[in-house]
UniProtKB/Swiss-Prot annotation:
Transmembrane regions: 421-437
Key words, A-Z: Cytoplasm, Membrane, Nucleus, Transmembrane, Transmembrane helix
Native species: Mus musculus (Mouse)
InterPro entries the record matches: Int2_metazoa, INTS2
GO biological process terms, semicolon-separated: RNA polymerase II transcription initiation surveillance; snRNA processing
Membrane disposition: Single-pass membrane protein
Principal subcellular localisation of the protein: nucleus
Name of this chain's protein: Integrator complex subunit 2
Amino acid sequence: MTPEGTGLQFVSPFAFEAMQKVDVVRLASLSDPELRLLLPCLVRMALCAPADQSQSWAQDKKLILRLLSGVEAVNSIVALLSVDFHALEQDASKEQQLRHKLGGGSGESILVSQLQHGLTLEFEHSDSPRRLRLVLSELLAIMNKVSECNGEFFFKSSELFESAVYLEEAADVLCILQAELPSLLPIVDVAEALLRVRNGAWFLCLLVANVPDSFNEVCRGLIKNGERQDEESLGGRRRTDALRFLCRMNPSQALKVRGMVVEECHLPGLGVALTLDHTKTEACEDGVSDLVCFVSGLLLGTNAKVRTWFGTFIRNGQQRKRETSGSVLWQMRRQLLLELMGILPTVRSTRIVEEADVEMEPTVSVYSGLKEEHVVKASALLRLYCALMGIAGLKPTEEEAEQLLQLMTSRPPATPAGVRFVSLSFCMLLAFSTLVSTPEQEQLMVLWLSWMIKEEAYFESTSGVSASFGEMLLLVAMYFHSNQLSAIIDLVCSTLGMKIVIKPSSLSRMKTIFTQEIFTEQVVTAHAVRVPVTSNLSANITGFLPIHCIYQLLRSRSFTKHKVSIKDWIYRQLCETSTPLHPQLLPLIDVYINSILTPASKSNPEATNQPVTEQEILNLFQEVIGGDSVRLTQRFSITAQLLVLYYILSYEEALLANTKTLASMQRKPKSYSSSLMDQIPIKFLIRQAQGLQQELGGLHSALLRLLATNYPHLCIVDDWICEEEITGTDALLRRMLLTSNAKTHSPKQLQEAFSAVPVSHTQVMQIMEHLTLLSASELIPYAEVLTSNMNQLLNSGVPRRILQTVNKLWMVLNTVMPRRLWVMTVNALQPSIKFIRQQKYTQNDLMIDPLIVLRCDRRVHRCPPLMDVTLHMLNGYLLASKAYLSAHLKETAEQDRPSPNNTVGLVGQTDAPEVTREELKNALLAAQDSAAVQILLEICLPTEEEKAKGANSDISLRNTQGVTTISTPSKETEEGEDNLLCNLREVQCLICCLLHQMYIADPNIAKLVHFQGYPCELLPLTVAGIPSMHICLDFIPELIAQPELEKQIFAIQLLSHLCIQYALPKSLSVARLAVNVMGTLLTVLTQAKRYSFFMPTLPSLVSFCRAFPPLYEDIMSLLIQIGQVCASDVATQTRDIDPIITRLQQIKEKPSGWSQICKDPSYKNGSRDTGSMDPDVQLCHCIESTIIEIINMSVSGI
């Protein structure tokens, strides 16, 4: 601080506080010199009429008067207050206007005229009014110049404010003027003016002390008008000094003023100076000092503007050559160094001397044994110096660098704070390697790093912190070995909590020390395997963990390079996981799988890691395999099970993707057995993961992707929809209805109830109703009993409600254990043939041949609840078969590849076997799907027994008058047992629903099935019951063009039903094509084939006309043409045929006249020759009937 105020009496904090609070008792205790400074305010207080009329103030006022009575200077102040201030203000305003007109020139003053002597002598000889005018004139002149200079600082020499004899009288006048003329002399403007004169800080403190309420206003004004960098200019330094004096007078507001400094980003030196003043008065030995906190907050805070502003202050301060002890920056650095040295007691460390180089001097002293109470403060100091050097550009002196290195290499106690301190020290060494400049310092650093390696296990076990600095050492060593310097820089910045610029070249010496002296790659690898896994690893555990080190070592293939097994460590870590999922786990699994399948180098193709064994995987799932999924205390968490499931699925996928690469290896990695996969409850685990999506991060979506690729039968849309119903609001309501009785039924009781089904249905129904209230996982123990007893539910007399309940329970179980459930169900529904032992199918059998599902008991075909289950399994196994064959094709891709000896001269043909195998696979899948569809369509046909009962007319979709409809039974039929809700109709609907899904999924299936053909009796059912049948319009032209007459007939019959169901422009064009084809075939077919073709297809022409009346003329012409051809082929019966041909011509020409005749019953049953067995004659009669039907339809307007 400048020596300008030296020797002057300033207002003490005690006196200022007394003035603020108007504490008369404390004011009375002041000494005469202290009281003299406050007289202007006290005299005004005593003389002016108060706003406070209370009795207490009256007493205080008496005390003030008594206090003032003995002071001689009071009389002069009273005389000053007696002046006419209104006239004075008017003269001052006139002088301001005059100066403004004259352009600020120093013309004649209205306030002060005819000065005979110097300003000081005039002041001495003048009375009170003139003294007021002298000071006011001088003050206004300075204020005017301040406003004219636009912020540029200047220094004004003024006798009035410099003469030590009259300072107190001038201060009295100044205070009275400001108090009486506040509008003319705003206190902030007066403060700005006082900065420009000598002793301005003293005058300013007196002025504020006499107006204590203006303290914050004055400080804020001075800061706001201040310079961005105060130590760079005289004005900045004077402003800083003045504000420091003010804050010394009112120390309680010093930190608030410092906040104003930061807020405005002005006067950084003042902020530091106030902090230094506060640190000296509020010094705390053990805790982090206010200086460290303040500077750290500026440089490490989120406000970039503040960070840049303070960084500029540090850089500018260093550029000045004269950084003397008077500099605020120098004082700050000195204080920080003192604090740093204060926590480093000098201790002779015999251990280090013993380990050190023999050439070291025996008198070396090392700072060691950092006290526990100093650790947090040491960490804060390290981060501060990192910020000063890395962000603000501070260049440490030799003394600072030496002390910093001693602090960094000190040894803290084994506490969490000690672990943090060591991590910070290590990163600071990496970030600022220039701190190590001499061989002795380098040796000290190496010894400290060696101590870190030896002590990290002890620190971790004692401190209880999972993220020890040992992992960071390993990680940095691995980064150095793989030359990932940018990763080291990111690690350093992350640990220090600041973004600093580190040149990769500065790490070269540290890299040499790490890779050659401390951590060779083999040492790193061997050490990493011995590092304990992190217990209950989750995202809540931050910092650098063993998993980070293992991940980097796996990426660099260090384990395989040095033949170190890492499988057990990874397995243990996966078992020790919990939610929320740590983000490094999935990348760890991915890189581990890659290290299993991909050799470390071409020269050593067998250098790979070992996969997790099947037994280890089974141990992890043993709790849920046996149905104990609801066990209260689980040995392994659901997170561990999901991670291992992710590992298995990813491993299998990668194995298939790298088949060609792995073929060249002598020791190929093996796929996990199907028996292992059958025992893992995949769907149950996926469902558990669905409820933990937020905590599992991306694991749930990754599992779904793998599931859709490798297990499409577990991703059926219907299952997801069903699962939503099971886990929705209804499930919550059912849980509310769950009674204790529902929980008491055991699987054994359910088996006993099933055994009693032939006699009584009540008990099994009651137990199953209770089971519907259980959750899916709670139902798992009952699965075997439910499936094994399905066969006896096929017996007659079993209520429909029992069957529906079994279906409902099966669907619930299907959400958690579909694959096991399907195998048990297929085996349970096998036909019960005496003397023949039933075969027990496995999961593999059913994936190879999905049609096994349909080789069930025939009674299932007329039991809709169980047929629904069967169709569900069939759909799943068809999808599973596709995935199985695709995987099998990839696994055996190398078997058909020709050997190099056989491929000479066959360049370009090496891929032929692959293409052939793919085609064979597609052909097999198409045959499999079409066979399933044909079997299902066959099931839709009524049996002989059902036909005998006349069920066909009532229970199937029929064609009435050429219109495909669903028949509506009479009331009598509804009351009968065979109605629209009969079993056959329900089974037909279920099958049509599945066929619709299959056709939509793969339209080629529909094409293949219709090219194969099926009974025409089913066409009304399939066209009306399968919404996707319209896709047949795309390939009917191709089907009609087939040479087989049966396919052409089937195509026209199919088209006739499609035209009625879908009367679209496309249908019209295909129908027109069909009519043209029929006309063409008429000219080429023989008599026998003509009869075989036109007899079944002529009714289709009626449907064409009904759907598309524009085809009427073409169809009528075709019919006449067919009749004429038939007549010409029967020369011996021309006499009999001529009348028919004549009638056909008349019907075509006058259809309205014949419509009435056709309705005559005698015509329908009349004299036509229907006894002839000649095919042409029968065809002519059929043509006549077709024409008449078309005419009736057109006349009636249908």
